[in-house]
UniProtKB/Swiss-Prot annotation:
Species of provenance: Burkholderia mallei (strain ATCC 23344)
Recorded metabolic or biological pathway in which this protein acts: Purine metabolism; GMP biosynthesis; GMP from XMP (L-Gln route): step 1/1
Domain Glutamine amidotransferase type-1, chain residue ranges per copy: 4-202
Enzyme class: ligase
Subunit text: Homodimer.
Recorded catalytic activity of this chain's protein: XMP + L-glutamine + ATP + H2O = GMP + L-glutamate + AMP + diphosphate + 2 H(+)
GO molecular function per UniProt: ATP binding; GMP synthase activity
Gene name of the record: guaA
Tree of life domain: Bacteria
Coiled-coil residue windows: none
Listed name of the protein: GMP synthase [glutamine-hydrolyzing]
Entry keywords, A to Z: ATP-binding, Glutamine amidotransferase, GMP biosynthesis, Ligase, Nucleotide-binding, Purine biosynthesis
UniProt keyword Ligase, yes or no: yes
EC numbers for this chain: 6.3.5.2
Amino acid sequence: MHDKILILDFGSQVTQLIARRVREAHVYCEIHPNDVSDDFVREFAPKGVILSGSHASTYEDHQLRAPQAVWDLGVPVLGICYGMQTMAVQLGGKVEWSDHREFGYAEVRAHGRTRLLDGIQDFATPEGHGMLKVWMSHGDKVGEMPPGFALMASTPSCPIAGMADEARGYYAVQFHPEVTHTVQGRKLLERFVLDIAGAKPDWIMRDHIEEAVARIREQVGDEEVILGLSGGVDSSVAAALIHRAIGDQLTCVFVDHGLLRLNEGKMVLDMFEGRLHAKVVHVDASEQFLGHLAGVADPEHKRKIIGREFVEVFQAEAKKLTNAKWLAQGTIYPDVIESGGAKTKKATTIKSHHNVGGLPETLGLKLLEPLRDLFKDEVRELGVALGLPAEMVYRHPFPGPGLGVRILGEVKRDYAELLRRADAIFIEELRGTLATEQDAAAGLCEPSQVGKSWYDLTSQAFAVFLPVKSVGVMGDGRTYDYVAALRAVQTTDFMTAHWAHLPYALLGRASNRIINEVRGINRVVYDVSGKPPATIEWE
């Protein structure tokens, strides 16, 4: 039996990143809502508890509290942001409004020598004080520490940015160690999980496969499962995992909705039928999808339509299976959190995902989502462990709605064809261009990345079709054609992302080829927006 860390979610958009950091330390953890019962906490028997942040205010909301059992267990507890504030209130301290709210980068000074922060710093002041570069996001602050606590960290505008009761193993920080912006955040969380809580680092992907296979078999029994293949990483890994568990009880349905990447259909069929020997049904539903999308410009409406049509196609195929009771999807954690679908239901909705929203209550199939609690990097690791080829596992993510969310506004077949070809050219240039020593010298990549393709050095890259026309000149004639935007980002978790600093020569070749080879596009632009404030996909 694995040691476990219990993460209590108060509704933060980045709670799942806490779980990701804990799992990176090879310790099993689960996220549960903050209002679980005392009996649940005791039966879970965690080695330690982490209290997440929240968009709520501890000062205003007296309902979002940790169960009393958390404080009765006698195990270490780490409070993060709101978690620090509720720890303070529940143990006898005070929280107050902050005159100087902190959102973004901050430098925190460590105080004393606590087990949590001892030896962890980014730099030291001339006076010898250890300093941490962190990410803050709070409007309230702890004004008075509970009895037994000592000051652990501070900033000029937040005098109590960290506190500790070492005797009981209670620690709290006002900043967010789970996000990549906090440089030493991973070390801090590992220190709490491994050293303070004493959890054994024995949870590995091989164990997850065995546990997931057992769960799938127990859930499904002898019933049949239908799964929609999009050609993306998530649905492919989900299919391989379910096929490992139940074999021919799984039927994969590959739906051509007219919004696929270039040669997508052939690649998927060759992979799953030819290499994995899975049952695959190929359905050409492009007329159905494009017909329902005609005249629809709102991105949320488009996503709902695509999700609805997927359900209809799956239901039609399921009726052909005598024992089909389950609809499987490649839903992963970022899909769930961006849809406001965290277990607490408190997170704010950013945009709906067709995997999570759009499924009507009248759906005649039960839902199977074996990847729902995994992050993208964990999904890739799982795919490798399952024996999937690298060209599939490390392919860039592709949204379930396909090119439908990469064509701004109304979706038309002609638009999809232009975008398909432009996207293929961009990806071809990324795959064919290797990072050079000059790129490293210019700061575009690390020296250790020289020789790798720019496709491998970016986390996601694609073209976007803009339904606006611009004037151009080709040969001796005037053109008035559409605009394509290129998007490439680098990220570790897909919750935050930086735009990729690609070499100008690469962008120039991609632009020239698209304009010359894709008749109908005469201008190419590059997206230099990060996430946040922008999302990775344009819609």
